[in-house]
Structures are given as structure tokens and as C-alpha cells.
Amino acid sequence: MNAEAKPGDWLGKVRWDANGLVPVIAQDAATNDVLMFAWMNRDALAKTIELKRAVYYSRSRQRLWFKGEESGHVQHVHEVRLDCDEDVVLLKVEQVEGIACHTGRRSCFFQKFEGTVDDGEWVAVDPVLKDPEHIYK
């Protein structure tokens, strides 16, 4: 347990990294499929709990990122879990329109390794459900 956490200080229980971030996995609440990986800071996690909607922290834009703010592919949060080391958050979500990835796919994990260590490659195995050019206008 995080020694710095005080009773009632649920944000203090999380083991934030040196940049004040925690990795987050979004998982489909109905199927348990892994949809995506992202980051949260304290504000993002607090907003996620408050709104019951996934809010992440964009490291490239240095700001909160409300999932679906541009695409409409919102994630309604059904459950929030913290792993045994208290340094990874799991969101069980309902993915609006079934598209979590900016590539227009259901999951960001659409590339599968095939082959051997000597001749392997990453192959896209999941279909594009919607052309990203029609998602981000």
C-alpha cells in the first residue's frame, strides 16, 4: 500500500510516476476485450470518477483528453480498478459506437505478431470499422 495515502485519500493511494501519471487500460465491460492504453493524472482520474466517462491525460498535448471529444466515441465507465501494486488503473467501459482506436478500429491492439524471431512481422488483423477521415473532420 502507498505509505503516503491517508484514509479517504483515494487519489493518494495510487502510485503516480515521476511525472504524476498512471497508466490506464480500458477494457470492454461486456466482453472483457482490451480496447486501449492511455495515461491519467490526478485531475483525469477524478474527472473520470465524477463524470463516469473516461478522461485521460494527453502527454503530447499536455492537457486533459475527454475520450470522444472529437470523434464521438465516448467511453462510459462502469467500473474503476487499481492493480495489486497500485500503479495501473483499469477502466471497464461501454465503448460508444464500438470504436476505441483513432484508426477507426474497435481496439488499439489490432496488430498481431506472426512468424518467428527471425522473420516475424506485425499484421493488422482487425478491420477498420470507420474511415478515420470521416471520424476526424
UniProtKB/Swiss-Prot annotation:
Its EC number is 3.5.4.19. Its cofactor is Mg(2+); Zn(2+). One of its GO terms (molecular function) is zinc ion binding. Zn(2+) binds at residues 84, 101, 108. It catalyses: 1-(5-phospho-beta-D-ribosyl)-5'-AMP + H2O = 1-(5-phospho-beta-D-ribosyl)-5-[(5-phospho-beta-D-ribosylamino)methylideneamino]imidazole-4-carboxamide. Keywords: Amino-acid biosynthesis, Cytoplasm, Histidine biosynthesis, Hydrolase, Magnesium, Metal-binding, Zinc. Pathway: Amino-acid biosynthesis; L-histidine biosynthesis; L-histidine from 5-phospho-alpha-D-ribose 1-diphosphate: step 3/9. Disulfide bonds: none annotated. Mg(2+) binds at residues 83, 85, 87. InterPro entries: PRA-CH, PRib_AMP_CycHydrolase_dom, PRib_AMP_CycHydrolase_sf. Catalyzes the hydrolysis of the adenine ring of phosphoribosyl-AMP. This is Phosphoribosyl-AMP cyclohydrolase.
